[in-house]
């Protein structure tokens, strides 16, 4: 009974891996087609070499066959390096444009907000709140730019490392190619996972910062409302003074005359 869930989980993992690999193959179908063409060319050269060896003239072709395999392997390595370099080049070309567009959107929103300050000031949204929001957007953009630069630098470093690893000897190139490709795939998968987690952390951090700023703005609004209520109560007028009624003065009669001085 316990083995059935394990088998199911193993099948689900295999299906997920197969789905990921199929998605990667669909995304990189042009490179896959080129790789298949290279394999077909190598196989064709190998078959021609076998046929010529069977005919008796395979001495020259036997010498040329390793050279063809080496050139095909080097061309494959060159194309793999170009595909690795294409990602940082795309990031370098389109990353600043995306950052510029996001900055334009932020500046437009800030301008609109500052244009409606006369409407928002009674609600308690002061210019300091808008300034804090704008600074948080700038900080998030700077973090995204630094993350893209770090990823580009790491990709360039790895591409250089792998390009140096292909050079030492021809036999080692042919033997270590699958291991290098496997290590490269694992490294790319690890980097994409780290990048996705970093982006998720960045989005969460910006969301928390925005919520904190909104909470501070609402608290400031309530404080301003309370202060305005206190001011309105103070400026509504002084408390009513107790005036002496006239009836009391009339009932008591006229005031007694003052005593005259001896000179008068």
Swiss-Prot record:
Bilayer topology term: Multi-pass membrane protein
Cellular localisation: Membrane
UniProt note on tissues of expression: Testis.
Keyword Transmembrane appears in the UniProt entry: yes
Residue numbers spanned by region Disordered: 227-264
Bias (Polar residues) ranges: 227-236
Protein name: Transmembrane protein 270
Source organism per UniProt: Mus musculus
GN (gene name): Tmem270
